């Protein structure tokens, strides 16, 4: 999957608006983190993802959360652990967005780094450790 463009992914945000993943933050790399409110390791890494997202400038990596969860569960979770980056929703299953982004094992959390042209640069199965995200994402911040 690295170097390839994933199939188009269009999902609702928390307000029910359909959003094309590739259209978020044009010209910026995307770090797409797939998670769920019931996933312990996902919950543990959310503050680190928020810190990373907040440290990005106008041209930095755009973080996008992709929750394989029910909207109300996600809203309740985000009241406890707020984030400033966009959150999209999908239902878990054999053709969910995580699978379409290359998560063949179906485990969470799962993160994909897309370059400015929305090609897959890197994939990570499992949680980030503190301080790991910036180095991992650095592959997407250079010139294309």
Language-model segments: residues:
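C-type cytochrome heme c attachment motif
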Residues: 37-44, 110
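Conserved hydrophobic/aromatic "anchor" residues
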Residues: 9, 34-35, 77, 85
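Thiol/disulfide oxidoreductase modules built on the thioredoxin-like
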Residues: 79-84, 90-138
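A short beta-strand-turn-helix
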Residues: 8-30, 98
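Hydrophobic beta-strand anchors of alpha/beta hydrolase catalytic cores
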Residues: 31-32, 63
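Aromatic-flanked redox-active Cys/Sec active sites in thiol-based oxidoreductases
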Residues: 33-38, 68
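N-terminal targeting signals for export/organelle localization
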Residues: 1-12, 122, 138, 142-144
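Structural microenvironment flanking redox-active thiols in thiol-disulfide oxidoreductases
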Residues: 43-82, 92-98
